[in-house]
Amino acid sequence: MRPKLKLYLDTSVISALFDERNPERKSLTESFFAEISKFDIYVSTFTLAEIEKTPDPVFKKKMIGKVSKIQVLNIKSDIEEIADEIILSGAINQSYLEDAFHIATAIMNEMDYLLSWNFRHIVRKKTKDIIRMITTINNLRQIEIVTPAELL
């Protein structure tokens, strides 16, 4: 039997479950979560910190409830180094350091996929190409960056 794929979820995937502003994305995310037992799912302490910053207490409580059932990755010492490289290479703007940390966490914990709905910074060709270059140069495991819908 093949091992389950290891998936890292950024905060946008968790928040999409409860975001009524985009019904299609919400529905696709719900469909993905209905299949979640097929995968090993992870978030990180960065995800938890972003959820804690959520100003809406009801929305925040729902997200905390959802991540409470997901394995949390601890931060490894080399994540900051890779996050810096992601920013210096232009994959992610310095203003969005959290996004670089999500990617670096997924890479350094050898995830198969990073799932995100963040098309502005993460799920885009430029970021994917630069991340592929960084992982190749540093002899790190390649990671696929996709939306939850792409794994349905």
Where is each model-derived feature located?
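Short, well-structured N-terminal submotif of metal-dependent ribonuclease cores
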Residues: 1-43, 50-64, 70, 88-94, ...
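A residue-level structural signature of the nucleotidyltransferase/glycosyltransferase Rossmann-like core
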Residues: 6, 40, 114, 143-144
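General small-molecule cofactor/ligand-binding pocket signal
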Residues: 42, 73, 144-146
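Residues at the C-termini of beta-strands that transition into short coil/loop
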Residues: 45, 76, 149
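Active-site neighborhoods of divalent-metal-dependent phosphate/nucleic-acid chemistry enzymes
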Residues: 72-128, 152
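Catalytic and substrate-binding regions of cell-wall glycan-acting enzymes that process beta-1,4-linked
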Residues: 136
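Short, C-terminally biased terminal segments at protein or domain edges
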Residues: 139-152
